[in-house]
């Protein structure tokens, strides 16, 4: 196995371990974060990750738009993700992940 790949996989585990310590996050937050980390792993980037709503919903097994929007919005409010939407159908939106919660609100 490639050493770089092992480092990235270790980093994913580190991110998830930190997220799991936050009592404000529930299973829906965690599966969305895991889906984002999975896409980042595929893209070879942990910071700026290109995402689409449909792909995140598929990977996280969230089947309804209200549930997806509720928990994705809360992740933004908590400061775990910074979302930069792309209004162009040919380009994916971008998510920037943070290891620690940037906001104490919520």
Residue ranges and their predicted role:
Residues 40-102:
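Winged helix-turn-helix DNA-binding recognition segment
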Residues 1-59, 77, 105-106:
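Short recognition helix of helix-turn-helix/winged-helix DNA-binding domains
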């Amino acid at each position: 196995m490639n050493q770089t790949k092992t480092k990235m996989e270790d980093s994913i585990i580190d991110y998830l371990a930190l997220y799991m310590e936050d009592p404000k996050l529930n299973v829906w937050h965690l599966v969305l974060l895991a889906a984002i980390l999975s896409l980042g792993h595929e893209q070879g980037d942990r910071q700026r990750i290109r995402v689409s709503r449909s792909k995140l919903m598929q990977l996280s097994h969230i089947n309804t738009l209200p549930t997806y929007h509720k928990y994705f919005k809360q992740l933004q409010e908590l400061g775990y993700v910074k979302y930069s939407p792309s209004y162009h159908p040919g380009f994916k939106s971008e998510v920037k992940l943070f290891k620690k919660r940037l906001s104490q609100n919520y």
